[in-house]
From Swiss-Prot:
Keywords: Cell membrane, Cell wall biogenesis/degradation, Membrane, Transmembrane, Transmembrane helix. Residues 1-26, 94-107, 179-186 are cytoplasmic. This is Casparian strip membrane protein 1. Homodimer and heterodimers. It comes from Medicago truncatula (Barrel medic).
Length: 186
């Protein structure tokens, strides 16, 4: 017998270690998907329920700020909701990867869909971030004045929802890297 061959009944340490590492990566993928789903859900709910009325409004004229006044915020809520739904559905495949660590085609599909969802989420967060910046600082050249001094609660909530969305984008990057690492171990 050659020195490198395995006899009947023996298990290669590399194969069992590799399978354990892939299982660990799959469990980490599952956990990160749950956290990202919670972050996108919280961002969508925080932005979607944001509105504020100024207290000095008269019965004829009321000053209010709501998320649906701006299309960028509506896009943000829709994108976060879509990504949250996707993450909930992708948990099924993530569980499959924990059970069967050799599934490669479904991992490739998840990587592609994860990149699409990350792009959608990053686009929505960036569009909303530009509006949040103008709400905080205004643009004197265009005569757009900052509104956050008057609508403080509104601005705090929309800024907080952006943080949750950007956390989800960062988690998507980690999820994609973990999936690619698991595929490369095949």
């Amino acid at each position: 017998m050659k020195g490198g061959s395995i006899e009947l009944g023996e298990v290669s340490k590399n194969a069992s270690t590799n399978k354990g590492v892939k299982r660990g990566l799959s469990i980490m993928d599952f956990i990160l998907r749950i956290i990202a789903g919670v972050a996108t859900l919280a961002s969508a709910v925080a932005m979607g329920t944001t509105d504020e009325r100024l207290p000095f409004a008269t019965s004829f004229v009321q000053f209010r700020a709501e998320y649906d006044d701006l299309p960028s915020f509506v896009f943000f809520v829709l994108a976060n909701s879509i990504v949250c739904g996707y993450l909930a559905l992708s948990l099924i495949l993530s569980i499959l990867h924990i059970v069967r660590s050799t599934a490669v085609k479904s991992r490739i599909l998840l990587i592609v869909l994860d990149m699409v969802m990350m792009g959608l989420l990053a686009a929505a967060a960036s569009a909303a971030a530009s509006i949040v910046y103008i709400a905080h600082y205004g643009n004197t050249q265009a005569n757009w004045f900052p509104i956050c001094q008057q609508y403080n609660s509104f601005c705090e909530r929309i800024s907080g929802s952006l943080i949750g969305s950007y956390i989800a984008v960062a988690l998507f990057i980690i999820i994609i890297l973990l999936s690619q690492s698991a595929i490369s171990r095949n």
